[in-house]
Amino acid sequence: MMAKFICFISRWLLSCRYKVSLNSSNLNKIKAKGVLILPNHPAYTDPMIVFSWLYRWFSPRPLVYESYYQNPLFYPFMVLVHALEVKDVQNDRQPGVHVKKTIQTMVESLKNGQNIILWPSGTLQNQATEKLGGNSAVYEIIQQ
């Protein structure tokens, strides 16, 4: 309930700067559980815009880098929306282990009917097409 209110306030604040249009007629028909949402990431504000608009229908668990998750300002909200903390692999001594653990957590969450929102590239889109490079989390999730 509190998370929906915060997302409502976020939508209102973001609408002061951005014009967002959403065809929600199709969203109202989706009753599935365990939905994997894969938006692209052209700008810094897109994750907040997409998350705040889709929360009312899906209540997705976002994947959030450790540095944002542990930030004292954001941490209460991260707990409120059941965000999944992702280790920053650039500073990680065992990136493969932590990535596999995060993917397994996502798979279990999806199987339990929770919805996940995952930005496949994990970085800003700075070209007309998004390059995923070696980011294979979506492939790994689908295989399981």
Residue ranges: model-predicted function:
Residues 1-9:
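Helix-enriched interaction subdomains in cytosolic or periplasmic regions
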Residues 7, 16-144:
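Soluble catalytic domains of membrane acyltransferases
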